[in-house]
Amino acid sequence: INNALKQGCRIFYTTPLKALSNQKFYDFCEQYGADKVGLLTGDTSINRGAQIVIMTTEVFRNMLYGTNFGAVADNLKDVRYVVLDEVHYMNDEQRGTVWEESIIYCPTNIQIIALSATVANCDELTNWINTVHSKTKLVNTDFRPVPLRFFYFDSSQPYKLLPLLTPDGKLNNKIKPEKPQWARGKDKRKKTYVKQIIQNLADNDMLPAIYFTFSRK
């Protein structure tokens, strides 16, 4: 984005979700100034001629539908970069073709920056983009803006959260396997500690949080 602004050209930033596009729009307006940022979704059009335009990937793909293969239409004039955020959506059964077509039909003079934190076959994807679009380089990083920290909830009283790993990356030896909570002929449902876990999170200033469970029961 900074390169586009310095070069005086335009950049499209695509996302798979309207909500994510809206969030990026507000973030970029705050960072770069509202006069430099536009938004295009299915039902919203704001400053569409801006240097930085955020849109859903479907909107970008539909722009390409109206041009000859490899050509640059008026709506792509001065566009030098296209960011495809969450490019792993290419594996989605219903919507994956949107990302494929966006890459295939994108003019080769436009540089594609494909972003994802979850693509497993990144080398294969790089080679494919290199074949159907233009020369492509894979850039890997293990940097996380928000570092992951793992904890284990000790259900023996007093209830507490224990670091899963030691500072050198080894399993915390204070964590012991839980004993089975049921015996033959008794209720086999495992006791849950939702309230105790949330209380521990609150006590350690770790809220808000998302509590994920595999069952509604």
Which residue stretches match the model-derived regions?
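Walker A/P-loop NTP-binding motif
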Residues: I1-C9, D27-C29, E100-C106
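SF2 helicase catalytic motif II
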Residues: V53, T57-R61, N68-A114
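Loop/turn-to-beta-strand initiation segments
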Residues: C9-I11, K36, G49-V53, D78-Y81, ...
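Well-ordered alpha-helical segments embedded in enzymatic catalytic cores
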Residues: D27, V59, V98-E101, Y193-I197
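Conserved interdomain linker/interface between the two RecA-like ATPase lobes of SF2 helicase motors
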Residues: I104, Q111-I113, T118-K217
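Conserved nucleic-acid-binding Ia/Ib motif block in the N-terminal RecA-like helicase ATPase lobe
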Residues: C9-Y65, N127-N130, K137
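A short beta-strand-to-loop transition that corresponds to the Sensor-1 phosphate-sensing loop
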Residues: L17, M55-V59, E86, S116-V119, ...
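Short, glycine/charged-enriched secondary-structure capping and boundary segments
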Residues: Y26-E30, T67-A71, G96-E100, N127-N130, ...
